[in-house]
Design a protein with these regions (language model features):
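Loop-to-transmembrane helix boundary motifs in multi-pass membrane proteins
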Residues: 120, 157-165, 323-331, 341-351, ...
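Juxtamembrane transmembrane-helix boundary signature
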Residues: 19, 56-57, 83-117, 124-138, ...
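Hydrophobic, membrane-embedded alpha-helices of multi-pass small-molecule transporters
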Residues: 46-64, 198-296, 355-359
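Transmembrane alpha-helical segments of multi-pass small-molecule transport proteins
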Residues: 122-126, 130, 151-174, 193, ...
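Hydrophobic alpha-helical segments and their helix-loop junctions in multi-pass secondary transporters
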Residues: 169, 173, 191-221, 229-232, ...
Length: 569
């Protein structure tokens, strides 16, 4: 209420965020948490909090992940299993940070970015998240189109499957109209399909479990060349997706948590962590199934080896995909499915296609939710869901359709590898905000990260940044056109500037709000956002008015000079 004229003041973006309102349809759906006096672990509470972590884990199981898994197994056998394990573990650590931010504040990360960052870097962050979401959507379009092609025995061409993905996505997006728990149950059903289908391939011809265990536990990189390093970075990029951090911080808002009680917040943080760990353990096992099957079945094999298997079963796809030569097999989602059909029988091909279809559909929906959170938070712009998904899918479908119609499926290999690398490059724009917000006592209060958590989080960031630097150097060495190289140089100069900005902001967030770093004129003028400047202006105002009379509400207000009045809100 405006104190000067008694009229209602317009609701600002900051006020709307503080009121934890949201225009997102998904966040209007809430799950109640049972209020129990029981001390200790509660299965009922775990069940109430189960959902957001499994929706988040979908990003660890999209078609881009599956392709990275099968290529890693086929090319390098069991050597990169440890990369998958540690990528999943690091994913859990950073997802934990984003979930804590949403749980403690009642705001998702994109909303907090609106008040914490300056407009120019904030817009750049939004653009990079849109690039990541669209890149992920392209992988889902490709995977779904290939699965439709395989399930239809080639009757629906891949470019036709690309077009179909627009319609089926719009159909699935209305599922939350039936209730949040049913939506989460549907996602669990899709994950179960992936576990059954990929698990079937794994147990049908069980690989050497000792080698699997060694690959997970013992880090090794025999004959480590740039291709193997790129594959390892691709696995990291396919597991830890930048937009997934923003998604997870929003999904946890679907639980009714009493934020006036520290115990309720602590319980929510604990159960969300347990649920996320369970969900990512399931995703790790599914990815391990795929890696193991192709490490056991395809590593060291040539095209003619696989072609002979296909000819023995009279498989119609084999001759078109595997040439009569002694080159090592270069496998993708389609040729991987065909190999399974030739190796295990036709049923294995269709089972594989169903698993890929489930991966593509589930990832599409979570990508849409992430896009809604990004627009709502970064821009204060809200679209209804069907407009949002059409926007993302329309952009993603153009290059996918072009490649599918005018080229062959092998062209998707290079595109998918590029997209996985793209995800990895965008990671600093999600990891640094997650570290900053979860460590800032001004935002999360007493629940801020401790010293060890801050150090581990920063080490994760520098590890990701170093891996990206290697990837960029290798990528730029392969570019021959000077004008393309010039554009990339310009982009990476901007990229580096924004990373430095985010790092400076993060360093300020790691310190006390009243520290000299936060009070520095350069930081306040160029780095820190509106929320911190408002914080200091408010504290400076109170410090200068402590000796003046303080009034809450009085009819005698006119008797006191205006300059001596301080309202307490």
């Amino acid at each position: 209420m405006d104190r000067t004229n008694g009229t209602s003041a317009p609701t600002s973006k900051v006020n709307r965020l503080q009121a934890t309102e949201s225009d997102n349809e998904l966040l209007e759906l809430k799950v109640n948490v049972p209020d129990e006096d029981k001390i200790g672990f509660s299965w009922r509470k775990l069940w109430a909090f189960t959902g957001p972590g499994f929706l988040m884990s979908i990003a660890f199981l999209d078609p881009g992940n599956i392709q990275a898994d099968l290529q890693s197994g086929a090319r390098y056998s069991y050597q990169l299993f440890w990369v998958l394990f540690w990528a999943t573990f690091l994913g859990l650590l950073v997802q934990r940070l984003s979930a804590r931010v949403g749980t403690i504040t009642g705001q998702h990360m994109a909303e907090i970015c609106y008040t914490e960052y300056r407009p120019v870097p904030r817009i750049f962050l939004w653009l990079m998240m849109e690039v990541a979401i669209i890149g992920s959507d392209m992988q889902e379009v490709i995977g779904t189109a290939i699965s439709i092609y395989l399930l239809s025995s080639g009757k629906v061409p891949i470019w036709g499957g690309v077009l179909i993905t627009v319609l089926d996505t719009l159909t699935f997006l209305f599922l939350d109209k039936y209730g949040l728990r049913k939506l989460e149950l549907f996602f669990a059903f899709l994950i179960t399909i992936m576990a059954i289908t990929f698990g079937y391939e794994f147990f049908y011809d069980l690989p050497d479990m000792l080698q699997v265990a060694e690959g997970i536990v013992i880090p090794k990189c025999t004959d480590c060349d740039t291709d193997k390093i790129s594959m390892a970075i691709g696995i990291i990029g396919s597991c830890i997706m930048p937009h997934n951090l923003y998604l997870h911080s929003g999904l946890v808002k679907t639980r009714n948590v009493d934020r006036s009680k520290d115990r309720s917040i602590s319980e929510a943080n604990f159960y969300f962590l347990v649920e996320s760990a369970l969900a990512l353990f399931v995703s790790f096992i599914i990815n391990l199934f795929v890696m193991s099957v192709f490490a056991e079945g395809l590593y060291g094999k040539t095209n003619i080896d696989v072609l002979n298997e296909c000819n023995a079963r009279n498989d119609p796809y084999g001759p078109a995909l595997f040439h009569n030569d002694t080159n090592l097999v270069d496998v993708d989602i389609q040729s991987g499915g065909v190999f399974l059909g030739c190796h295990f029988g036709a049923a294995a091909l269709y089972i594989w296609a169903v698993g890929i279809l489930a991966a593509g559909q589930s990832s599409t929906m979570t990508g849409c939710y992430a896009g809604q959170f990004a627009m709502e938070g970064f821009l204060n712009l809200t679209w209804v869901r069907w407009k949002r998904v059409l926007f993302t899918r329309s952009i993603a479908i153009i290059p996918s359709f072009w490649v599918a119609y005018y080229s062959d499926i092998s062209s998707f290999n290079g595109m998918n590898d590029f997209l996985n690398a793209l995800m990895s490059i965008q990671l600093p724009f999600a990891v640094l905000p997650a570290i900053a917000f979860s460590s800032n006592t001004r935002i999360v209060g007493k629940f801020a990260n401790g010293v060890c958590q801050k150090i581990i989080s920063l080490l994760i960031f520098f590890l990701i940044f170093a891996a990206n630097a290697l990837l960029v150097v290798e990528f730029m060495e392969a570019i021959e056109k000077k004008w393309v190289l010039a554009l990339i140089y310009i982009y990476f100069i901007i990229y580096l500037i924004v990373c430095i900005y985010l790092l400076l902001h993060c360093i300020a967030a790691l310190t006390d709000p009243d520290s000299s770093i936060n009070r520095n004129w350069f930081m306040r003028k160029w780095i820190l956002g509106k929320s911190i400047t408002d914080y200091y202006d408010r504290h400076h105002f109170l410090e200068n008015t402590t000796s003046r009379p303080i009034l809450e509400d009085t009819e005698d207000i006119d008797e006191i000079p205006e300059e001596d009045v301080v309202f307490v809100y």
